[in-house]
């Protein structure tokens, strides 16, 4: 679980407006932060299959949000993946 201070920073860095907490950009950035925090755990605990299921669910949800954003506004999509360092 990411700390609330880190979560607030991620929201602030990716928000489209001052009160934006639910745009696809913010949701993808928060999921990316959670995924990046969990990745070292699975390098150390390779047999944690129940936890890996949750990780794969987060990755799938992020992919769906990115696909939605790409369909709606390709410029915002390319800017976001460049900012977060994700592959296409």
Swiss-Prot record:
Pfam families: Ribosomal_S15. It comes from the Bacteria. CDD domains: Ribosomal_S15p_S13e. GO terms for biological process: translation. Keywords: Ribonucleoprotein, Ribosomal protein, RNA-binding, rRNA-binding. GO terms for molecular function: rRNA binding; structural constituent of ribosome. The keyword RNA-binding applies. InterPro entries: Ribosomal_uS15, Ribosomal_uS15_bac-type, uS15_NS1_RNA-bd_sf. The keyword Cell division does not apply. GO terms for cellular component: cytosolic small ribosomal subunit. HAMAP family: Ribosomal_uS15_B. PANTHER family: RIBOSOMAL PROTEIN S15, BACTERIAL AND ORGANELLAR, SMALL RIBOSOMAL SUBUNIT PROTEIN US15M. Belongs to the universal ribosomal protein uS15 family. NCBIfam families: S15_bact (TIGR00952). One of the primary rRNA binding proteins, it binds directly to 16S rRNA where it helps nucleate assembly of the platform of the 30S subunit by binding and bridging several RNA helices of the 16S rRNA. Forms an intersubunit bridge (bridge B4) with the 23S rRNA of the 50S subunit in the ribosome. Part of the 30S ribosomal subunit. Forms a bridge to the 50S subunit in the 70S ribosome, contacting the 23S rRNA. This is Small ribosomal subunit protein uS15. It comes from Acidovorax ebreus (strain TPSY) (Diaphorobacter sp. (strain TPSY)). The lineage of its organism: Bacteria, Pseudomonadati, Pseudomonadota, Betaproteobacteria, Burkholderiales.
């Amino acid at each position: 679980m990411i700390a609330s201070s880190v979560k607030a920073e991620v929201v602030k860095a990716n928000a489209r407006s001052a009160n934006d907490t639910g745009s696809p950009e913010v949701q993808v950035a928060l999921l990316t932060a959670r995924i990046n925090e969990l990745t070292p755990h699975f390098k150390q605990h390779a047999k944690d299959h129940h936890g890996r299921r949750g990780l794969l669910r987060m990755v799938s949800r992020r992919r769906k949000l990115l696909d939605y954003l790409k369909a709606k506004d390709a410029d915002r999509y390319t800017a976001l993946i460049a900012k977060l360092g994700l592959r296409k």
